[in-house]
C-alpha cells in the first residue's frame, strides 16, 4: 500500500513538472514571437524621428524596398485599403535565433494622419476580410490610433499586407480637415542585426575587437565558436564569442587586424520605408464638381441641338 502511494506521489510530481515546463515554454515562445514590434514600442515614443527616419532602421541595418498603395482621395467616415508590399525572394532562408535556417518573417508600421485609424471589424466587407486573413493589428500606443503595427508574420503568406483604414469625419472630429495628407510606412523582412540594448544578434557579421594571432578556436557543442586572439607584442589574449549562425572566415594561426571580419554576414533581409499621399475629400465639393460637369454636358447638348435647328432653318431658306 505504501509503495502504491509512493508511486502515485512521484507520478503527481512528474505531471506537475511537465505542466510547468510546458507553460513556461508556451509563455516564452509567445513573447519571443511577438516581441519584434514591442522592441520599438518600448524604446521610442514615436516610431518616426524628426529626421523622417523610422526607428526600425536602427535594428534592421540593410536597406530594402517597400511600397504603399492608397486611394488618391477618400470621403469622410469611409473604410479604405492601404496596401503595403514588402518584396523579397521567397526562396531565401534566414538564420534563426538557434542558428538553424528558416523562412523570413515580415512586419510593417504605418503612420497615418491624425484622425485616421484602424477600421473596426464590423465595418469590413467580406472581400476585405479575406485579404486581411489572420493578421492581427495593434496601435503603436493606446492613445496613438493613427500609428498601426503588424508582425512578425510569415513572409511567404504576407509579403503584401492590407491595412483596413477608417477615414475621419470633420463634422464630428474637430481636428480633421479636408486636406491632402502624407502617409508614412516602414516594412522589414527577416530578423534584425542589433537588439535595442545595442547587442548584436546572430543575424549579422562579427569582427575582431583586437589585432593579433588566432591562437585557439573552440567549436561549441550547441553551435557557435570561441576564438582566442593573442597579441604578439604582450601576449594579451582576447576571447571572441560567436553565436551559432554566421560562418567562420578565419583559422588558427592566422594574423588578424583590428576590426577584421571573423564571420560572414548571414543577413538576407532588411528594412525599407516609403510614403504616399491621400486627400480627405469634401462631399459637397464632389457634388459641386458633378453639378458643374453635368451643366457642361447639358450645355454641349443644347449647343448641338441649337446648331442642328439653325442648319435646318438655313436649308429651308435655301430651298425657297
Curated annotation (Swiss-Prot):
- Positions bound to heme: 36, 56, 59-60
Q: Which cofactor does it need?
A: heme
Membrane-spanning intervals of the chain: 286-306
What keywords are assigned to this protein? Answer: Electron transport, Heme, Iron, Membrane, Metal-binding, Photosynthesis, Plastid, Signal, Thylakoid, Transmembrane, Transmembrane helix, Transport
The record's subcellular location field reads: Plastid thylakoid membrane
Q: How is the cofactor bound?
A: Binds 1 heme group covalently.
Known InterPro entries for this protein? Cyt-f_TM, Cyt_f, Cyt_f_lg_dom, Cyt_f_lg_dom_sf, Rudment_hybrid_motif
GO CC term (a single one): chloroplast thylakoid membrane
Q: Where is the signal peptide?
A: 1-35
Give an example GO molecular function: iron ion binding
**Superkingdom to which the source organism belongs:** Eukaryota
How does the protein's chain sit in the membrane according to the entry?
Single-pass membrane protein
Q: Which Gene3D superfamilies does the record associate with it?
A: 2.40.50.100, Cytochrome f large domain (2.60.40.830), Single helix bin (1.20.5.700)
Which SUPFAM superfamilies does the annotation name? Cytochrome f subunit of the cytochrome b6f complex, transmembrane anchor (SSF103431), Cytochrome f, large domain (SSF49441), Rudiment single hybrid motif (SSF51246)
The Gene Ontology biological process annotation of the record reads: photosynthesis
Pfam families associated with the record: Apocytochr_F_C, Apocytochr_F_N
- Record-stated family: Belongs to the cytochrome f family.
Described by its record, this protein's role is as follows:
Component of the cytochrome b6-f complex, which mediates electron transfer between photosystem II (PSII) and photosystem I (PSI), cyclic electron flow around PSI, and state transitions.
The cross-references to HAMAP family, in alphabetical order and at most eight, read: Cytb6_f_cytF (MF_00610)
Quaternary form? The 4 large subunits of the cytochrome b6-f complex are cytochrome b6, subunit IV (17 kDa polypeptide, petD), cytochrome f and the Rieske protein, while the 4 small subunits are PetG, PetL, PetM and PetN. The complex functions as a dimer.
| Annotated protein name in UniProt | Cytochrome f
According to its UniProt entry, this protein's organism is Cuscuta exaltata
Q: What gene, per UniProt, encodes this protein?
A: petA
